[in-house]
């Protein structure tokens, strides 16, 4: 094939999913001339599985991405259909924001952002090879012969490398949602000396919402919480948000699965690759948890301009006929019509023990990797890695020191540290239990932890930085007010209404919080902090309520940091 130069660039990003988009934007926004290669322009920022952003621990990642100057939180807020705060009945450390998003709008808004970003060129094409010289990356060759000379390459191919989809006996060499797969880059990775293995994930069927009966199901409305992005101040009212619905599998659902395990690819030998432990198929759940009479399902809208409904919790690779029978056993789905059948997908990924904490490969300088090719699962984990890979590539290109976030600084630090020091034998999912300093790594203080770092690296815009400084000052003012004295008579009446004895003289608002009085009650009774955003107020409340635990956690983090730096 005749090759030709496509022009010289600072960096090439291979893949335009959630990792690739963040990587390309981080590079371009910090002044690096960047190309992003995608197999299909219509798959930029595509959500091949769940139509949502955030969730337990994942919401923390999105807020951290945003605090550093990334795009996922901004785009999620633009396209959100519904917000909810998960684990509200638990402690502040594990509460996580989640949003249902409009899948098509998420793609189009992300594509628009890329198209209007200075220093960034988008090209549709498949990366065929990585060029190197003397142990350093020098460029990328495409399947059509175009050559992109560059000094940094970020591989963010998601689940597309040698992908194949499986639905019963029907096996297709394809990427998610029928998109073309990438067939050439695995050979380049093997040639460069990297290990490649096979992982597997899956997705549920999409239903025609007109054939779903929600009248007898439990509605899950949206909530008036705070947005993902620190650039935004508010979210739509509950009444303007789109509801989801709760339903369950039953004994008949389970019988169909158990009676047909010989036709289930996961159990008849068709699929042998490793799947995600924390997002199992319905077949796996029914077999592994045989004592459970039912499994929870959520019916989630795919968008405002489509009738498609995503059935969270009913991922499967059963044959088409069994899928139809199985779905119709579920309450509310008795007459449902499937518009997209469920499937499992197998794909190539690397061993992250071959990767440095900067997400640069060990053997080839300037070659980075991010996202599901690193053995992770989830849009948020991918976006976090993409941001860090792009930012570190940019810092290297600009002759600056790399950014390696510690485990006590960010969930992103926990994610990357786990990957490059422990590796993973299954699709890795971020969870709050993985973060030993989770009480200090809350989603409400992500900007305090990371925005200054992002600004110093050149990624946080001046607009975002000024807003951060204003919020920081507001936090300090709020903390000072809460340290001031409350009206004694009103304070006594309040604590007695909570079944507590009267207070001694000179009580402060902070004293009331330490006694378990919610800040929202203080705002209502005393009329304080009327204009302070909810997340700022709650952040200050958490710092007071868990003051002793936070002090201990920060002391432990300092001790661990000293041990790591001691020769």
Describe the residue ranges of each PLM region.
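Flavin-binding catalytic cores
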Residues: 187-197, 252-271, 300, 314-344, ...
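Active-site-proximal substrate-binding core of FAD-dependent oxidoreductases
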Residues: 43, 203, 360-363, 394-427
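Conserved beta-strand-loop-beta-strand element in the redox core of flavoprotein oxidoreductases
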Residues: 131-147
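Internal hydrophobic alpha-helix adjacent to the cofactor/substrate pocket in enzyme cavities
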Residues: 65, 382-405
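Conserved N-terminal/central alpha/beta ligand/cofactor-binding core
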Residues: 7-8, 23-129, 144, 152, ...
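Beta1/beta-strand and adjacent pyrophosphate-binding region of the FAD-binding site
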Residues: 4-19
